[in-house]
């Protein structure tokens, strides 16, 4: 399953929509909830400075759209 993680690059400033970034994780889990928990743990362990805003499971249609926009790249820690 592919998860899109929305985050701010620092926890020092208040979150602003304009500075929200995203990364994509490919996580092999049995449930959506387990995937969200695993995604949060991976990001917090590898990028503790990131302020995670939201974690979204991408449907097939959303995944296709993300690939078409050119911003899609799986992050590996």
Curated annotation (Swiss-Prot):
Alphabetically ordered keywords of this record: DNA-directed RNA polymerase, Nucleotidyltransferase, Transcription, Transferase
Endpoints of the signal sequence: none
Catalytic activity reported: RNA(n) + a ribonucleoside 5'-triphosphate = RNA(n+1) + diphosphate
GO cellular component terms, semicolon-separated: DNA-directed RNA polymerase complex
E.C. numbers: 2.7.7.6
GO terms of biological process kind: DNA-templated transcription
Top EC class, one word: transferase
Cited InterPro entries: RpoY
Family label: Belongs to the RNA polymerase subunit epsilon family.
Subunit structure: RNAP is composed of a core of 2 alpha, a beta and a beta' subunit. The core is associated with a delta subunit, and at least one of epsilon or omega. When a sigma factor is associated with the core the holoenzyme is formed, which can initiate transcription.
Name of this chain's protein: DNA-directed RNA polymerase subunit epsilon
Species of the source: Streptococcus pneumoniae (strain Hungary19A-6)
